[in-house]
A protein has these predicted regions:
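A short beta-strand-turn-helix
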Residues: 1-17, 42
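Extracytoplasmic/secreted envelope proteins and their assembly/folding machinery
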Residues: 9, 30-40, 157-164
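Loop/turn elements at helix/coil->beta-strand transitions in domains of secreted/extracellular proteins
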Residues: 13-18, 46-53, 83-87, 123-125, ...
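Aromatic-flanked redox-active Cys/Sec active sites in thiol-based oxidoreductases
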Residues: 16, 20-26, 58
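Extracytoplasmic/secreted cell-surface and envelope-processing proteins
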Residues: 27-30, 61-65, 97-101, 106-117, ...
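Structural microenvironment flanking redox-active thiols in thiol-disulfide oxidoreductases
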Residues: 28-83, 95-99
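Short, internal strand/loop/helix patches
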Residues: 70-124
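Thiol-/selenol-based redox modules, centered on thioredoxin-like
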Residues: 122-170
Length: 170
């Protein structure tokens, strides 16, 4: 649905939005993005359609294969056993396009960090949540807060889900 589109926070204006920052070539990042995808599907199944999510690959990982992150037909990884993911997976660039006007000084072109990862001071596996007005609410690192239901008996997953619902209801 979003293939080839330039998407980001302004694309989801008026809705709670989550951004997962990962490395498309690492199995742990792929597994976490799969859980974020499952959470999104669960929310939609429960009638919650105004919480949007997407993933963003770091510029430094631009040459990694995307196949198993989005679970297309070329992927044979066990992280894709439930089929293709529906969440958009975007690529951060290091071209400085986002480093002007209000963002001047927050990032630089060609510094090998990527514009969005640089501006938002991203750490691998961060999940950044914005409210309906595009304001920063919180950041949860999914390395340390593993949302897998096999970890912490699903408590972290449920905590993240309830947080999204509470932000949505504000």
């Amino acid at each position: 649905k979003y293939y080839g589109d330039n998407i980001g926070p302004s694309f989801f204006s008026g809705q709670v939005s989550c951004y997962y920052f990962g490395k498309q070539g690492w199995s742990t990042c792929r597994a976490r993005f799969g859980i974020v995808n499952d959470l999104y599907n669960e929310l939609v199944t429960e009638g919650i359609t105004d919480v949007k999510m997407m993933g963003v690959n770091g510029y430094q990982y631009i040459n990694d294969s995307i196949d198993c992150m989005i679970c297309n037909d070329e992927c044979t990884s066990s992280t894709c056993s439930s089929g293709p993911r529906i969440l958009p997976w975007a690529q951060d660039y290091d071209d400085g396009v986002n480093c002007t006007d209000d963002n001047s000084g927050l990032c630089e072109a060609d510094d090998t960090l990527g514009d969005i990862w640089d501006m938002w001071d991203i750490t691998l596996r961060d999940l950044v949540i914005l409210d309906r007005d595009g304001r920063y609410v919180t950041r949860i690192n999914l390395t340390y807060t593993n949302p897998d239901s096999n970890s912490t008996c699903g408590q972290n997953y449920e905590t993240i889900k309830q947080l999204l619902i509470s932000i949505r209801n504000q």
